[in-house]
Amino acid sequence: MASQGTKRSYEQMETDGERQNATEIRASVGKMISGIGRFYIQMCTELKLSDYEGRLIQNSLTIERMVLSAFDERRNKYLEEHPSAGKDPKKTGGPIYKRVDGKWMRELILYDKEEIRRIWRQANNGDDATAGLTHMMIWHSNLNDATYQRTRALVRTGMDPRMCSLMQGSTLPRRSGAAGAAVKGIGTMVMELIRMIKRGINDRNFWRGENGRKTRIAYERMCNILKGKFQTAAQRAMMDQVRESRNPGNAEFEDLTFLARSALILRGSVAHKSCLPACVYGPAVASGYDFEREGYSLVGIDPFKLLQNSQVYSLIRPNENPAHKSQLVWMACHSAAFEDLRVSSFIRGTKVIPRGKLSTRGVQIASNENMETMGSSTLELRSRYWAIRTRSGGNTNQQRASAGQISIQPTFSVQRNLPFDRTTIMAAFTGNTEGRTSDMRTEIIRMMESARPEDVSFQGRGVFELSDEKATNPIVPSFDMSNEGSYFFGDNAEEYDN
């Protein structure tokens, strides 16, 4: 990318660091991971969980959610000012599952947020350790990305539901900082901006006064984040137009939806990180592994190695397939919801199938579900190979932008073609090329038309054996070029809607 020099690496964002060398980054990411691990061990002690119960992913999610809620300052402030019946703003909790007499029981727990904050800080040498909190947010976001298809949200903001591959990180909270911004897809950023523009159209005071000034700063900051994700000059120039608009309205809305569509072929750079549940880090720390001393990276072999020797369990509903549940969590762990299934299958070493064919619902269990019939099983999260996570979008060098199937945002840096259905995508680009962005639009459409689905991306990049820690011998897989593999293709996954 052109602006490489000005960007901090994702690990630096992850750890709020200034410029650091590779060893320092590995150490500070390791420090963040061991903090999460220590916190998790302490919480399992507090809750008197057995080893098995502590490795249950549903318990992990509840504990993670509690600490995120305890540190959600804006929401905590709001809850104190707007008390609602039956909700104590100072407490947080959720369902904890325990094994009693051969059956799984649900127990609702409640803790003081202050107490949770104390335990978290204690596990992190007295720091607030925001990086660790963000890490857990990204894990939850990756799990949502693999579990739900955001068609309704796309339609609501006037975008095409087939653009779901652009929606990575769409459920990340606003407070997820630079590390969160790095993993957001083009569609997610566009959707956030469109929501602001719509509010501005409906509420004339939105951009006015002291509050309006803050709103404006937020708007421009989001525009700059989105601009930084685009890799072609024309797309970036259009973002400048959107950002500089005196009074954002319909023209900006049009430009943004145009840009979102263009990203299906001229893909943006979106970071991918393997963020694992706390119940993986806890036992690793407990077994004496020193993450800070050994160093850790979210984009290399480390998460793969960690998952190779971790035991994680999950509750299973009566008609769910444990192997399918495992696939869902594996994809979430590697942030691979929008990766080509051919690539994921090769790395995992077992066939990864589309969401619509999975006999499994989400990982979370609703409070009204019957526990009587609930079983549990081991999640198979191991892989056959490992590969480096990418943040490039996989555009080939000739055009700085290549073909992208209507549903892929690559996760792994592995050579393949990125197949896409040009007719479907180009059909969306009829007509409107007039107005102040006409020359940029024309240029973008020209680039899209010259993109070929058979172009090879990530030339020469391959996967590695798990014994090849230094990534010395890339194995370049050969894929059936004609066969696209998108996860949400023609699908009926549940909606993510709160």
UniProtKB/Swiss-Prot annotation:
SUPFAM superfamilies: flu NP-like. Keywords: Capsid protein, Helical capsid protein, Host nucleus, Host-virus interaction, Ribonucleoprotein, RNA-binding, Viral nucleoprotein, Viral penetration into host nucleus, Virion, Virus entry into host cell. Late in virus-infected cells, may be cleaved from a 56-kDa protein to a 53-kDa protein by a cellular caspase. This cleavage might be a marker for the onset of apoptosis in infected cells or have a specific function in virus host interaction. It is found in: Virion; Host nucleus. A motif (Bipartite nuclear localization signal) lies at residues 198-216. Belongs to the influenza viruses nucleoprotein family. This is Nucleoprotein.
